[in-house]
Amino acid sequence: LGTQGWECIAQRYWLHQVLDLLLAAIDTSGPLVGEPCDGDNLFAQMMKSGTTQPFVNALRTLQYLDANAADALWQTLFPAIWRTTQKRHQTDLNHALIGCVTHEYMLHQAPARPNVVQSLLGGALACSPTLEIPPYVLRYLGKTFQAWYVSMEQLQHQLFSLRSDDAVRESTQDALAEAYAELSEADYFYGLWRRRCMFPETNAALAYEQSGKFAEAQVLYEAAQVKGRTSGVPLTESEYNLWDDHWVL
């Protein structure tokens, strides 16, 4: 992903080619089944004597016929590769994936369904340990490539692994809140902000706004702004922007 250039086929679902290269690297001389099969019928005899070569060759051919099948295969194969990769190589692969999905030529994929970005993020989401993708990158990819679900799931996974005082945690919550707002997922938006806000006035104002009591909410947003400027209580820029935006609304 990081060393091969895909510009020449950027308008195609080029994971077909990636999968073909990966499957071609598999040692197909091994047995088809990991354990001996019981029985003397023809099927059992074929399983005992068979190798993985016909199976892998069939996969290489069939995945070219359907992008959805290739998408499903990638989301199965990539996590398996990730699990067996050494830690230092996982870091390299993580960086390569980020560089790939943020490349300008990927914009050709935006109208396609499925598209390469959706598949790459889906494969990353299934990995353990979780890949680390910058929150602003995930928000951009979700909006640009209609990968809302998988990008929000990835943000949530990353959020659980971050320390409460980590600056990245703040940006992750910002990206997740913006994604909820873009999709008009009001209850998720309010729930996230009510858990993370530092001022009780913010919590109460959000509760009023969620209940449709906008006049009461505006009073509390204004009170929070005054308190934030005068009290010396630690304040994040995100919470101040929330007051500003919602007080105007």
Give, region by region, the residue ranges found by the protein language model.
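Eukaryotic intrinsically disordered, low-complexity segments enriched for acidic and Ser/Thr/Pro residues
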Residues: 1-249
